[in-house]
């Protein structure tokens, strides 16, 4: 997710700096690949081994917010909200902590590192619930 996030972000920053649509198209291709290929197993962002995975979701969220809000690419909002909804529904409800595998319920009291716990809150901050 990190590589996709930074590719999307770099493409968007180049698009904003130059106005060249090719860069926006590249960002869209990166977002589409993340959503349609990397996330196809559960229709959720994938997680790999490593303690830093959750922060990658936060970085992805930052650049997806730029793609959605600054570039009008709202087709990603349902996918992003699905991740939020699954991650929050499967949190450790005693502590309200989310883990990195959004499709799995968190075991109450289990160790959840701060990076893993950061992904869903980052998405929630950038893509708040509809009122």
Model-derived features: positions:
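Extended, leucine-rich alpha-helical cores of fungal transcription factors
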Residues: 1-3
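CBM-like carbohydrate-recognition segments
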Residues: 22, 27-131
């Amino acid at each position: 997710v990190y590589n996709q996030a930074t590719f999307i972000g770099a493409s968007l920053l180049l698009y904003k700096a130059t106005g060249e649509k090719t860069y926006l198209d590249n960002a869209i291709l990166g977002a589409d690949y993340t959503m349609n290929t990397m996330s196809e197993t559960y229709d959720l962002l994938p997680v790999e081994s490593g303690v830093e995975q959750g922060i990658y979701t936060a970085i992805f969220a930052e650049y997806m917010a730029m793609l959605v809000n600054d570039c009008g690419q709202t087709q990603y909002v349902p996918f992003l909200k699905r991740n939020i909804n699954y991650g929050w529904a499967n949190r450790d409800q005693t502590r309200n902590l989310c883990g990195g595998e959004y499709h799995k319920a968190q075991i109450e009291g289990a160790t959840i590192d701060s990076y893993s716990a950061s992904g869903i809150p980052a998405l929630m901050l950038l893509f708040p619930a509809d009122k």
